[in-house]
């Protein structure tokens, strides 16, 4: 039996994703931006406009006329440029694969043109559509079969940092590129919903195959992380999963929130927009986040916190960011903590362990006892 990545066309989607094989996506940019796989590179056979022209031709005159039009649109220097891009990808990634939407004509043409230029490069049979279907089915299966455990705790408790120190945990916020709370927006935005789902499915596959005997540890999230929605199958599994609660003192949570939502967020905006514009975008980001929760805060509390935020921004412009701690502390004490305490109380019977970060790490380090506890809790 030949090893995976042996240069042959494949429909072994599991090993394709587990191995992290380089993927050359030959679909049009509009298709790629709607949804793609982690790390895939888009070097299309046709531009969006060319694809639209070929599609109209196919509807009016049939497949052969559409193929002929496609060859007329991508010929000469245009064809040479695209083939050169594929050649360079193949040279950089000899263990990779190319694909189109269905694994049909477009990827066959790309493969043929590459072969004519002296490069044999394999393709994924079934293409993007079959790979996407495989990931959806895998995610459904994992959510039904895996022993989930949720890491819970008050806002600002460093749960994401703790997850990173526990082998086999899956970081949903990293996949969604969002810090989870109302203030969790990142400067460079979030993936599309389909990109998020694909990345999540790949992460779950790798966790299950790399840590088969461990429970699947996720952070206790709501159904939305920013604008990325958790799949229904995962939400159902999370609604029944046992909880491990990390307990962190208020002042530690204030400091953690200050670093992440002020210092790190400002750095992100400045890297993206420059020093001055970056600060203004950062300030608007905080204002908008506060505005988004104004109804839940109530009119008076929203006004008070907004005034504290503006005062902190004014001092920050003068070089002193420390005053942000004041409104962060109030927001945690008066808004987030009561809300989360209420939510946690409703699920108190699902709590299987609670302690500080060191105790939680120790709890998960003893995987055999963790497994037993989780199993008992679900029976």
Swiss-Prot record:
Which keywords does this Swiss-Prot/TrEMBL entry list? Selenium, Transferase
Which InterPro entries does the UniProt entry name for this protein?
Answer: Rhodanese-like_dom, Rhodanese-like_dom_sf, SelU
Query: Which part of the chain is the Rhodanese domain?
Result: 17-140
Known EC number: 2.9.1.3
Question: Which residues carry out catalysis?
Answer: 100 (s-selanylcysteine intermediate)
The molecular function terms of the Gene Ontology recorded here are: transferase activity, transferring alkyl or aryl (other than methyl) groups; tRNA 2-selenouridine synthase activity
Q: Which domain of life is it from?
A: Bacteria
One of the GO BP terms on file: tRNA wobble uridine modification
Q: What is this enzyme's catalytic activity, as reactions?
A: 5-methylaminomethyl-2-thiouridine(34) in tRNA + selenophosphate + (2E)-geranyl diphosphate + H2O + H(+) = 5-methylaminomethyl-2-selenouridine(34) in tRNA + (2E)-thiogeraniol + phosphate + diphosphate; 5-methylaminomethyl-2-thiouridine(34) in tRNA + (2E)-geranyl diphosphate = 5-methylaminomethyl-S-(2E)-geranyl-thiouridine(34) in tRNA + diphosphate; 5-methylaminomethyl-S-(2E)-geranyl-thiouridine(34) in tRNA + selenophosphate + H(+) = 5-methylaminomethyl-2-(Se-phospho)selenouridine(34) in tRNA + (2E)-thiogeraniol; 5-methylaminomethyl-2-(Se-phospho)selenouridine(34) in tRNA + H2O = 5-methylaminomethyl-2-selenouridine(34) in tRNA + phosphate
Spell out the NCBIfam families in the cross-references: PRK11784.1-3, tRNA_sel_U_synt
Outline what the protein does: Involved in the post-transcriptional modification of the uridine at the wobble position (U34) of tRNA(Lys), tRNA(Glu) and tRNA(Gln). Catalyzes the conversion of 2-thiouridine (S2U-RNA) to 2-selenouridine (Se2U-RNA). Acts in a two-step process involving geranylation of 2-thiouridine (S2U) to S-geranyl-2-thiouridine (geS2U) and subsequent selenation of the latter derivative to 2-selenouridine (Se2U) in the tRNA chain.
- Family named by the database record: Belongs to the SelU family.
Q: How does it assemble?
A: Monomer.
Can you say what this protein is called?
Answer: tRNA 2-selenouridine synthase
Source organism per entry reads Hahella chejuensis (strain KCTC 2396)
